Amino acid sequence: MENAGGAEGTESGAAACAATDGPTRRAGADSGYAGFWRPWVDAGGKKEEETPNHAAEAMPDGPGMTAASGKLYQFRHPVRLFWPKSKCYDYLYQEAEALLKNFPIQATISFYEDSDSEDEIEDLTCEN
C-alpha cells in the first residue's frame, strides 16, 4: 500500500511539475520569436487595446494622421485593400508592387466588382 501511495505521490508530483513546466515553456517559446513583427503589438512591446474602427480615424484629419506628412502612422488590423476585378490580372503585378512600396503593411487584397470592367464592355460590344 505504501508503494501505491508512493507511486500516486510520484504521479501527482510529475503532474504538478508538468503543469508548472507548460507555461514556462510557452513563455520561452514566445521570447524566441521576438524578432518577428506582429501588428497587434506596438514597437514598445505593449499590446494594442482593442477598440472598434471608427470612420473618423480614416478621415484625413482623424487622430491616426500625422500633421507633417498626412500619412497614417497607425493602422487597425486586419487591413483590407480593395482592388477592382478588372485589374486583377492585367496590371496587378506592376501596380501592386508600386502600392506596396507606398503602403508597406501587412494587408489582404480584396477584389470587388467594378462597373467599368473590361469583360463587361467586351460582352456589350459582342452582343451588338
Curated annotation (Swiss-Prot):
Name where it mostly resides: nucleus
Q: Which UniProt keywords apply?
A: Developmental protein, Dwarfism, Nucleus
> What S-S linkages are listed for this chain?
none
Sequence motif: WRPW motif, positions: 37-40
Q: Which domain of life is it from?
A: Eukaryota
- Nucleus: present as a keyword of the record? yes
**Which GO BP terms apply?**
bone morphogenesis; determination of left/right symmetry; embryonic pattern specification; negative regulation of transcription by RNA polymerase II; Notch signaling pathway; ossification; post-anal tail morphogenesis; somite rostral/caudal axis specification
**Where are the compositionally biased (Low complexity) regions?**
9-22
* Cell location: Nucleus
- Annotated segments matching region Ripply homology domain: 77-112
One Gene Ontology term, aspect cellular component:
nucleus
Q: Name the segments for region: Disordered.
A: 1-63
InterPro entries (UniProt xref): Ripply_fam
Q: Which disease is it linked to?
A: Spondylocostal dysostosis 6, autosomal recessive: A form of spondylocostal dysostosis, a condition of variable severity associated with vertebral and rib segmentation defects. The main skeletal malformations include fusion of vertebrae, hemivertebrae, fusion of certain ribs, and other rib malformations. Deformity of the chest and spine (severe scoliosis, kyphoscoliosis and lordosis) is a natural consequence of the malformation and leads to a dwarf-like appearance.
The UniProt family comment states: Belongs to the ripply family.
- Record's domain comment? The ripply homology domain is required for transcriptional repression. The WRPW motif is required for binding to tle/groucho proteins.
Function of this protein? Answer: Plays a role in somitogenesis. Required for somite segregation and establishment of rostrocaudal polarity in somites.
Protein name, as recorded: Protein ripply2
Task: Point out the gene that encodes the protein.
Answer: RIPPLY2
